[in-house]
């Protein structure tokens, strides 16, 4: 697959947030961390929106280090009308590898992952 540009951004969020990594939600960790079934997360997202929650913190399912992620559920969650920072990254996907590349004169970056992190287990 040819490289495709992706815009990533950093923004300030000011809203009611729940963290699935903390009690009482952590007891259902198996529901939130299934790489092949998002049903539990989708049901939680619907309930969170209905309860007026603006964002959800959770652990990455595919990051081997289980880094934190932030899902914004409403545009009202953003504290400012514009992002603090934007970057353009090139995404390349092959059968075996996923590569993110950022070409920047002062700070070029590249992150490469095995595609198996995104495939369903057999």
What do the predicted segments below correspond to?
Residues 1-122:
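Active-site and NAD+-binding cores of ADP-ribose-processing enzymes
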